[in-house]
Amino acid sequence: MSNAREIRSKVQSVKNTQKITGAMELVAASKMRGTIVKMNNVRPYVESANTIIKNVTAASIDYPNPYLFDRDVKRVGYIVISTDRGLCGGLNINLFKHVLKEIKNNIEDRVGVDVCVIGSKAENFFAKLKDVNIVATAHYNDKDKEGSIRAIGGAVKVMLDKFTAGEIDRLYMSSNQFVSTIKQRPRLQTLLPIQDIFSAEEIKANKEKATKGHWDYIYERDIEEVLNALCIRYIEAQVRGAILENAACEQAARMMAMKNATDNASDIIDQLKLDYNKIRQAMITQELAEICSGAAAV
């Protein structure tokens, strides 16, 4: 009887946990939809900034903008975007494995590595690595969006200043890419030098266009200052978009993790009920046997 009572207690406990995971699944789904809307709202800004940089660069094709041209790589920087919370499956671990492979390749090639981490999970992970220098940290908090944006902007500025000063020669960003609700994958993209502005053929063509005045703006300051400011805004917008996309990945992964937990709870409840019924059946069989034995003795 004690075993049956214990099983009933376990069933009730699993049902309570199932209610919690079910509620967390619904909350994650709601947050994911809201974050996807924000993520899609950032993309037009990034695309417009890209177009303007192309036009301004075409008008000042001879200006050696430090954000646009490659140089010998002696030290690199990484901006790694993770989550602040867990319960999102293997989202962070898969990201860390992906970026760690690239970092190890750089270390083997005797290229120094500086890291800016956004999110407590990345901060805790990279703090344990001896060969990686963490130069900036930041966190994104929905409850304090303005403070989070300032903190992230400051962390990104540290990496931009390092690139401008020549302390790092290339800047990468590692984050999760939102493919679908059930699929998210790690992504590593080059932030600096900006590689998605012009190909070699476009540079040659735009130099010819610039002499004919195809692209022209009225600048309040000189064109070099405007182009530098545009490049910085472009990088900041890319990081902001990546943070929102990573947040969407987090909620999608959490939603699926909670759904799996809820489904597993149902399987556990079914198994516990089966065990309970077996115990009851054994008890009833024993009682019947005792009754029959007593009747035979009479």
UniProtKB/Swiss-Prot annotation:
This chain's source organism reads: Francisella tularensis subsp. tularensis (strain WY96-3418)
Any one GO CC term of this protein is: proton-transporting ATP synthase complex
According to the record's subunit comment, the protein's assembly and interactions are: F-type ATPases have 2 components, CF(1) - the catalytic core - and CF(0) - the membrane proton channel. CF(1) has five subunits: alpha(3), beta(3), gamma(1), delta(1), epsilon(1). CF(0) has three main subunits: a, b and c.
- State if rRNA processing is listed as a keyword: no
In the UniProt record, what gene is named as encoding this protein?
atpG
Top-level taxonomic group: Bacteria
The record's Pfam families line, in alphabetical order, gives: ATP-synt
What's this protein's family per the entry? Belongs to the ATPase gamma chain family.
Keywords, comma-separated and alphabetical: ATP synthesis, Cell inner membrane, Cell membrane, CF(1), Hydrogen ion transport, Ion transport, Membrane, Transport
The entry lists its GO molecular-function terms as: ATP binding; proton-transporting ATP synthase activity, rotational mechanism
The UniProt function text for this chain reads: Produces ATP from ADP in the presence of a proton gradient across the membrane. The gamma chain is believed to be important in regulating ATPase activity and the flow of protons through the CF(0) complex.
Bilayer topology reads: Peripheral membrane protein
For this entry, the protein name equals ATP synthase gamma chain
Tell me the organism's taxonomic lineage.
Bacteria, Pseudomonadati, Pseudomonadota, Gammaproteobacteria, Thiotrichales
Q: Which compartments is it annotated to reside in?
A: Cell inner membrane
Which example biological process does GO assign this protein?
A: proton motive force-driven plasma membrane ATP synthesis
Principal location: membrane
Record keywords: Signal included?
no
